Structure formats: structure tokens, C-alpha cells
Amino acid sequence: MSVISMKNLLETGVHFGHQTRKWNPKMAPYVFTARNGIHIIDLQKTVQKAKEAYDALKKLTSEGKKVLFVGTKKQARGAIEREALHSNMFFINNRWPGGLLTNWNTVKKSIARLKKLEAMEADNSFEKEVKTKKEVLTLRRELEKLRKTLGGIKDMATIPEIMFVIDPKKEEIAVKEARKLGLKIFAVVDTNCDPELIDYPIPGNDDAIRAISLFLETMSNAVIEGTGGVVEQPRFSEDLDSEALALEYQGEYDESGKFIMDEDADSKKSKAEEPVIPTAEEPAITTIEVDQNE
């Protein structure tokens, strides 16, 4: 039994990969076709790999293993934090602190500093620690910086056994550290990623907000089920990615999170508006009908 329906995958744009000129050939087994300069991901493979990842994550967490959710791109930050907290696990959703895993003893000192500053804030003792308003302001800025970077792992006593990543290409440093230490790595891999670096790759769009939410909510459920909690239905429809959907994902997200149409996408856009005649072997993605009861 699948853990994500084909209907939900289509609705959230999971099948839209990157432009063909940006692909990683190692993703070939997961590509269905190319259409208007964009690779279309084989959703049958996504269903299969999502099920494998779900079952493995459920089993590992049932054994008491902990998960670190990682996703620092703007469109992933909210869902990363929400689903990590929902499953009572840990997260990094801003900048990855280099050496977080490989230099853990140093990172623990920074976490201890964060907790000390939070305790000082709670009992209003900043003024007792320093003498001037400028020094108080410096402490508060230090607190906010540490909270932003390490807030999602401040209760992480040891290095976790599992990492779940959105966009392992962007989070390549995190993936390298995890591989070096032997963590089990789960990740959503778009057509520009190297799936061979991941223990449990799930082929899919790692840029669309709703696709990211669908994957994270589903895998959060695997953790909750593994730890004996109550599983909820994915709530991905609460997130909307209408701008990218209107442009048929023919572009990239910039650092501010705005979806920008690619420089050569205008001509592709006009071609995309032409009707696509499906064949028996290759149904048009834009005309797939899905059983509403699936």
C-alpha cells in the first residue's frame, strides 16, 4: 500500500524536475520523459521509493534512533521546522553550521551558551551580567544569532543516527558530514541531484512549496508511527505555490524565495501552451486523470 497517492503527487507538482541542461545523468532511472525543456519525474518510482523510505524511517525510529531534518532554502524552512517539532525531532532550517556533526564537541559548547543566554533572558538577568546598555544589546544579538542557527538542535544531546534532507545538492556539506559519520541519509532528490550519495532517495520536485510539504508531512508521519504516536493525514494543501505553478516550474527560486522564470523559458512557455497529444506509451502529464478515491 502506497504512503503517497498519485493524485497528491500530481496536485503538488512533484513530477516537475529541473531543466534538462541542468540534470545529473545518475537520475536517469527516475526520469519519465522530457517535455518543453524540463525533465518529468517518473511518479511510479516516486511512489515506490517513498514507500521504501517510509518503512525504513518507521523501523529505525521504532528502535529509538533520532532524526535531524535539514532544509535551508527559503521555501523549505517553515515545513522543516513544523514537521520536526510535530514529530519531536530536531532541525536545521537556516544556515548549516559547518562541522555541526564532525566537530560536535565544539557545537555542544555553542548550544550550552545558547541555553545560558536563554536562561538569562527568562529571568531578566542580562543587566546583572554586564554594566552598559550596549553590552546588553550585544548579548541579545548573540542570543538571536545562536537561536536562529542552533535553536532546532538545542535539545539534541548526541549526534543523531538519521538525517532527512530537502535538496541534498544545496545541503552538500551536511550530506558529506553525515556520510563521513555513517548516518542513514534520506532525501528528496530532484533531477539535478546525485542519488548515489543518499541511502534512501525519493525522486521528486524539491523546489515547490507544496511538494516539499507533502514529503515532509508524510515522512514526519513515519517518525510518529515509529515512535508510537498518532498519525495525521498530510496537510500539504495549506501551503500554496501558485506563482511557480503558473510558470509551470520553468525557472528557479532565488535566495529571497521568489520564483524567477528562466532566461530561455519564454519560448518554452509558448510551446507548452500547444496541445500535447498523448500516446498509449506516454500519456500527457497535463491531461492525466486520477481516480478521486485513490
UniProtKB/Swiss-Prot annotation:
Disulfide bonds: none annotated. One of its GO terms (cellular component) is cytosolic small ribosomal subunit. One of its GO terms (biological process) is translation. Pfam families: Ribosomal_S2 (PF00318). The keyword Membrane does not apply. Belongs to the universal ribosomal protein uS2 family. This is Small ribosomal subunit protein uS2.
